[in-house]
Structures are given as C-alpha cells and as structure tokens.
C-alpha cells in the first residue's frame, strides 16, 4: 500500500480524512490539510502519540508500515512564532491622554492558548502576555500589584514602553507599600477583597525577595530575657491544652513565634489539682534551674531557655479541701495519710512521662526525677461530698528503650462510699469521716488470701446450692425421708430405684441439668405432661363438695326417680359398699401418688 490513511481531528471536533503518500513529510502534510482547515501551514501543529511532529520528519519514520486509519491531532496557533511582532510595544510616541493608553492596550488581540503543551509557547509570546497583563492593570490604577513585572520582561528580552517608564506609577513599582496608599487602590480594595489579598501576597513576595538579596541588612527583633533567666508567661503563651510555653527569641524563626510550645499535654509539668475530678492538671510555677541551649544555624547565636525545675514543684489545693491533705509529707500534720501500706519495693516512680517537645533531646532528660506525689490517695470535694481519688503515681511507670516513659493513667474516682480497694494487691483505703472537720484516712493492711475471682469460681456453686436448699426446704425434707426408706429397705432393686429418683430430683432442683433439659424438646414435653397431672390432682383435691338437690318431676322414669344412673349416686353407692379397711387402703394409695408427683418441679 503506497499511501497512508490519516484522520486529522481538532479541538472543536472538526475531522478530516486524507490519503497521503508514504514519501511525504510533515510539512507537506500540513500544506495538504491547510486548505481544509482554512489556516496557513506555519500555524498548524500536528500531534501524534503524545509528541509534536517536526516539519522535516518523514511520515515513514512515524507510521512505519501502518495500514489502518491513523489519527493525528491538529492544533491551530493564534500567532505565528516566526513572524510575530509586538504591536504598539515599540511605539516611540508618548500618549497624551488616558483614552489613547487604553486604545493602545486594546489594540493587542487577546491571546488564546490552543497548544496542549505550554512549553511550546515561545519566550516572545509569554512576554507579550505579561506586557498585556501589566497594561490592563496599569490602565485601571492597579499597576502596583505587580512590582516585579519589569524584571520578568527583561528576562525575556523586552523592556517597558517609553510612556510607561516615564509615568509616576512605573517609577514606584519597587515600592508596593507606597502604591497601597493611593486612594483609588484603597477604594478598590474595600470593594473587592480578592484584590486586597493579591496586594498582600505581592507585598510578601517583595519582602521575601529583599530578604533573599540582602540577608545581612534585615534586623530581627529579639525579646530580651530576664536577668534571672526565668520564662515570661503571658496570656499569649498559655495554650488551651494547659502546657507552659517557654520564652523564645523571635529572631530565630520569624514564622514560628513560639518554638517550644507543644499541643500535647505533658503530665510532668503539672501537679494534680485536688478539686478536679477528671484529673486535669494545673500549670506549673515559673521557677526553673535547667537551661536548654538552642543554636541558631543562620546567625550562630546561642540562647539559653530555662527548663522547669521539677524539684520545686508545689501542690495546689482548693479552699474547700482541708490543708492537712497536702501530698507533701512535711506539710502533713496527720500521720495516717502517709502510713498507707504498700507491698511494692519501689512505691514511687523514678521517672515520668517525657514524650513532649519541651524535652526535645534525650540528653536533657534527668536520670532520676524527684518524687512529685509522695502519697497514694487524696480526698477531693465534688458536688458537696468528699471522695477518694487514686493518684497517678501509685504504680511505677514503664520505661522504654528510648528512655521515655509510658503516659500516666488518669486518676480514678471511687463511689461516694469512700472506699478504694486494689483487687490485685488487696490494699484498701477508707474515708473514715467524710466531713469537713475530720477528713482523714484509716488504712488497712493488705490481705494475701485467695484472689477474689478464684474464690468466686469455687464457692459460687455451693452458695447456689445453699440458696436452693433454703428455697425448697420442704422438698429436701422429703428427700431425707427417701434416704431413710432406702437405708432400711431389704430389697436391693427398690433401694437402687429410690436412690436414682432422689439423685435425679436433687440435680433438677440444683439446676445442674438445666442446660440439658431446656434444650431437649422430648424432656420438655414429658415435663409438661407431669405438670398437667399435678395441676389436675390439685384441682380435684381443692374442689368443694357438691350438693345434689333433687327436684321431683312427675314425668321422670323409674330409674331416674331411683337415682341409680347418676355418677355421683354410683360413686356414693360404691363408697358405701367398701369396708373400712378398703377405704383406708385407697386413701393411702392416693397419698403415695400425690407424694410422688410432688417431686416434679413446677415452672
């Protein structure tokens, strides 16, 4: 096949199919399709397989032996990259009025990027667009928004027009602050917030460029530190998380005013507040003795920032809690608060949580931290009542390999009964007198007995059996009688039968067979039948005697007049025919049956 079948498509969905010989080049293909798309060949750009085709490339190098229909994408450029000149940019005549400036600005046609690759635009085309943008903003009085546009034009080989260079607005391009003071720009900024934001961004860019060019001329204001190297705490330095932010030099990093603040709460910098039930922490005092040295890489200055001294931390208590409940044993007048027994060899932790940016390096972490909370428990006043609260340092913390400690657990609040018991160790603390006059503890020695869960595992079935014995006392009296009968019975078969019945009834009443009985439908149907027999027997036993009233009737037959055919009369007749011994025997049999049926438990 000596020709290629090429389909050319444009952005506006215009399609053309052409038969092109294999020996043609890309430029000859452009000349062939230029008539169809009504554009000169030098403004046409063909794209195939994501590449812009060069004019001198033969089609055989691109399509090789393709026999099917091949698709090329066509882009029509607005300006000719080889012959485009800058209109009205080289004009030497200076306009005399604002109308002539706007007319010269509008003489530049609005460019429209039709190429799929922005890099294809030449430097001259990009410079044209920059100049058009500057002219449009300068005509409206907003030329100060682009202070660096003349540098961009110079990088592309262009310069501002003569009338623009001589204008007072062009002379103030480097000073964006002075241009912001113009009343026309101030009015536009009030009306349009987006222009105001653009002006602020342009001012920041100008400041950054000045700092980049002249880093030595920029003077950074630093906050002086106190003579005692104590941090200055203000309302701006205290965050919502409760951390204490240390004083810092603003010259280190102008974009981060506080280099030592942390959004995470550090329990090491606080003491437990006695009036806070949720265990939140109060801020630390300003005393400090450890200085951290931070080196500024840019200026080489050394700033000593104090670190809080953990040994001088003092407790904070509310006025509603008496003073004798202070965690400090030196201030505690009542010896019972510090004599709470403990079975741990190391009751207090030797370290605390240091997973905070305030302790940035492990070299600043002391190996042995003073004890913050020397007692296990404290009283808190909440909703008019006193409660016991376990302190966070009741158990030694876990130390990891990176010399950091596990976070402290939140203090637990007990019930208003005022008793706190450790189930693992058996240690107890009681609020002996929960009133404002005598709030103190009564400790109890730990008991090293069987754990509670082990005790309940073995004693629960026996307690369950005792409760069943109390609930079914009459039934177990009958079982005791069964035991007597089986003991003095000479027949082995009767003894085995009675013993098995007694065992089954015992298991039924204790509930040991409940899982098997409740899930077996056959046993459930048998139990329902036995309960029905019990109900029928009790109904017959508890019914009242019926009175038979004879009403004489002349139309009755002889048998009816005699009354021999009625059921009650027949039962009475049979009862009269029995002897006294027979009646006693029938009563005993019925009693035994009722006694046997009473063993079946009722629902």
Curated annotation (Swiss-Prot):
**Ranges annotated as biased composition (Low complexity):** 219-231, 280-289, 315-329
Classification via InterPro entries? HERPUD1/2, Ubiquitin-like_dom, Ubiquitin-like_domsf
- Which Pfam families does the entry mention? ubiquitin (PF00240)
Output a single Gene Ontology CC term carried by this record.
endoplasmic reticulum
Where is it located? Endoplasmic reticulum membrane
- Signal sequence residues: none
- GO BP, sorted A to Z: ubiquitin-dependent protein catabolic process
Q: Name one GO molecular function term.
A: polyubiquitin modification-dependent protein binding
Residue ranges with Polar residues bias: 94-117, 162-178, 246-264, 290-314, 330-348
Location (main, coarse): endoplasmic reticulum
Protein name in UniProt: Uncharacterized ubiquitin-like protein C1E8.02
| TM region positions | 496-516
What's the protein's topology in the membrane?
A: Single-pass membrane protein
CDD domains in alphabetical order: Ubl_ubiquitin_like
Biased composition regions of type Basic and acidic residues, renumbered to the chain: 569-578
Q: What is the lineage of its organism?
A: Eukaryota, Fungi, Dikarya, Ascomycota, Taphrinomycotina
Where is region (Disordered) located? 85-121, 159-178, 206-348, 544-578
Keywords in alphabetical order: Endoplasmic reticulum, Membrane, Phosphoprotein, Transmembrane, Transmembrane helix
The Phosphothreonine modification is found at: 566
Gene3D superfamilies per record? Phosphatidylinositol 3-kinase Catalytic Subunit, Chain A, domain 1
């Amino acid at each position: 096949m000596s020709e290629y079948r090429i389909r050319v498509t444009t952005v506006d969905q215009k399609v053309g199919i052409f038969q092109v010989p294999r020996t043609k080049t890309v430029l000859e293909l452009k000349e062939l399709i230029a008539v169809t798309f009504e554009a000169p060949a030098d403004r046409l750009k063909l794209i195939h397989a994501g590449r812009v085709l060069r004019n001198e490339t033969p089609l055989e190098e691109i399509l090789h032996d393709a026999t099917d229909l091949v698709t090329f994408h066509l882009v029509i450029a607005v300006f000719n990259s080889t012959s485009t000149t800058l209109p009205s940019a080289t004009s030497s005549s200076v306009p005399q009025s604002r109308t002539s400036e706007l007319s010269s600005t509008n003489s530049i046609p609005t460019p429209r990027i039709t190429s799929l690759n922005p890099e294809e635009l030449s430097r001259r085309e990009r410079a044209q667009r920059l100049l058009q943008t500057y002219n449009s903003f300068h005509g409206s009085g907003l030329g100060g928004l682009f202070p660096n546009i003349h540098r961009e034009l110079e990088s592309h080989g262009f310069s501002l027009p003569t009338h623009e260079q001589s204008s007072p607005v062009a002379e103030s391009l480097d000073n964006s602050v002075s241009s912001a003071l113009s009343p026309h720009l101030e009015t536009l900024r009030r009306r349009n917030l987006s222009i105001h934001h653009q002006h602020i961004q342009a001012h920041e860019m100008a400041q950054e460029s000045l700092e980049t060019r002249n880093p030595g001329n920029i003077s950074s204001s630093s906050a002086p530190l106190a003579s005692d190297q104590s941090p200055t705490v203000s309302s701006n330095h205290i965050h919502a998380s409760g951390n204490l932010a240390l004083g810092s030099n603003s010259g280190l990093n102008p974009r981060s005013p506080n280099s030592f603040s942390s959004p995470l709460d550090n329990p090491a910098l606080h003491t437990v507040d006695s009036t806070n039930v949720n265990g939140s922490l109060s801020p630390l005092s300003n005393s400090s003795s450890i200085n951290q040295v931070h080196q500024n890489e840019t200026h080489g200055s050394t700033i000593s920032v104090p670190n809080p001294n953990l040994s001088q931390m003092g407790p904070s208590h509310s006025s509603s809690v008496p003073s004798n409940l202070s965690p400090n044993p030196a201030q505690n007048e009542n010896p019972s608060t510090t004599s709470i027994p403990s079975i741990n060899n190391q009751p207090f932790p030797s370290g605390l949580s240091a997973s905070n940016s305030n302790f940035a390096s492990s070299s600043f972490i002391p190996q042995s931290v003073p004890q913050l909370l020397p007692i296990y428990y404290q009283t808190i006043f909440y909703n008019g009542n006193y409660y016991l609260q376990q302190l966070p340092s009741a158990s030694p913390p876990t130390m990891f390999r990176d010399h950091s400690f596990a976070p402290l657990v939140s203090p637990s609040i007990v019930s208003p009964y005022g008793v706190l018991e450790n189930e693992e160790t058996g240690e107890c603390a009681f609020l002996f007198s929960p009133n404002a006059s005598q709030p103190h503890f009564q400790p109890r020695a730990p008991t090293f007995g069987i754990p509670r869960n082990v005790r309940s595992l073995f004693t629960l079935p026996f307690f369950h059996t005792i409760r069943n014995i109390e609930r079914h006392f009459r039934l177990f009296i009958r079982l005791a009688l069964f035991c007597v009968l089986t003991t003095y019975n000479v027949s082995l078969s009767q003894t085995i039968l009675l013993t098995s019945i007694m065992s089954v009834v015992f298991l039924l009443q204790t509930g040991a067979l409940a899982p098997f009985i409740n899930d077996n439908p056959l046993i459930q149907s048998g139990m329902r039948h036995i309960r029905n027999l019990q109900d029928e027997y009790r109904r017959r036993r508890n019914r009242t005697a019926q009175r038979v009233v004879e009403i004489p009737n002349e139309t009755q037959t002889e048998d009816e007049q005699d009354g021999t055919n009625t059921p009650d009369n027949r039962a009475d007749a049979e009862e009269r025919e029995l002897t006294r011994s027979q009646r006693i025997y029938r009563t005993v049999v019925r009693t035994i049956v009722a006694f046997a049926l009473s063993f079946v438990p009722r629902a």
